[in-house]
């Protein structure tokens, strides 16, 4: 990055309802969007033919639109199904990459469904306990500590 930024340099970009830092390199700037990790950001930049050394604020509007179309429709750009974060969706059986607010909604809907059907995972979420088989005898305690009274 040069010491003097040109006039069209954007310090903060608004992409998919998220503020993206324009001073970061494009691959790492995309990771600030929920649902996009480093691996997906890397492959999206390669598919869009964007220079990886460019900063996010240096991108043109056309390049940003190109990146967002690839994120919205990754299967059309030959990104494999195993790369996506929503595989064989419960309702429609489709493969998709869910990002930003849609990711929060899908996660909340999944947890509500698990709670509604009284699934073991759903019940653990409902009770506020650990879900993934961790031990809970000594760790994960909340509330006031109860001391041991001394014998007299």
Curated annotation (Swiss-Prot):
GO BP term, pick one: translational initiation
InterPro entries: Rbsml_uS13_C (IPR027437), Ribosomal_uS13 (IPR001892), Ribosomal_uS13-like_H2TH (IPR010979), Ribosomal_uS13_CS (IPR018269)
Domain of life: Eukaryota
One term under GO cellular component: cytosolic ribosome
Pfam families: Ribosomal_S13
Subcellular location: Cytoplasm
SUPFAM superfamilies in UniProt: S13-like H2TH domain
List of residues that carry N-acetylserine: 2
GO MF: mRNA binding; rRNA binding; structural constituent of ribosome
Location, primary (coarse class): cytoplasm
Keywords: Acetylation, Cytoplasm, Ribonucleoprotein, Ribosomal protein, RNA-binding, rRNA-binding
HAMAP family assigned: Ribosomal_uS13
Family as reported in the entry's similarity comment: Belongs to the universal ribosomal protein uS13 family.
Stated role: Located at the top of the head of the 40S subunit, it contacts several helices of the 18S rRNA.
Official protein name in the record: Small ribosomal subunit protein uS13z/uS13y/uS13x
Gene: RPS18A
